[in-house]
Amino acid sequence: PSARVTVTGGGTGVGISALLDQTTDIAMASRAIKFSEKMKAKAAGEDLAEVPIAYDALAVVVHPSNPVKQLTRQQLEDIFRGKVTNWQQVGGDDRKIVVYSRETSSGTYEFFKESVLKNKNYMSSSLSMPATGAIIQSVSQTRGAIGYVGLAYVSPRIKTLAVSYDGQHYAAPTLENAINKTYPIVRPLYYYYNRKNASVVAPLLDFILSAAGQKIIKESGYIPVHKE
C-alpha cells in the first residue's frame, strides 16, 4: 500500500519538540532523548517509544588541499575547543584553523560534543551551521576549515580524516570500518513516536526495519541495525 510521508528538517531537538507538541507523528533523532524531554512528555501524558533504525558514522572533514591525513581524538578536542588554532600545530601548513559546527539544536552537535569533546564546550568562536549541507559548502570553500558530517553526506568536494581514539590505531570513516567497529565515531539513529499513534506509524517502521528497508539504509551510506 502507498503512504505519503512528509519530512521536515531542523535537527533532533526540533523534531522531538514537534513530537511533544503533537505536530508530527515521528521524530527522527541522531541522539537519545534527553531527561528533560522525557519529563516534558510525562507531564503531557505522552508515552514515547524509541526505535533504533540505523547507525551513522560521523566523518571529520577538511578542505581537499589540506595535507593533514589523520588526527587523534585529543587533537580534535583541542581544535574544536580552541586550544589548537593553527594547522601547523598538528602537522599541517601554517594556516589558521576555521571551525565549523552544527547548531545547538542538532543531535549531531550533541553527539560530537559527547564522543569527541568528552562533554566539554565547543570554542565560542566556532561557526554554527543550520544543516550538514552548509558545513560541506563552507568547508569546501575555506582552505583552513574543519567540520563534521554524517558519512552518507561525504562528497569529493571535501576531504575526510582518519581518526584515532588511542593515539595508535587510525581508521578512515568508511562504511566497512564503521560496521567492523574500527572507526570510533559512530552513533545510533532513532525514530521516536507516541505509542497512542502506533497504528499510524507502524507501516513505516515495519518497512524501515524490514530487509528491504535496511538494504536502502546501507545503500544510502548508513549502517543497518540488522546484520544481513
Could you tell me what each predicted segment is?
Residues 1-228:
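Exported/periplasmic ABC-transporter solute-binding proteins
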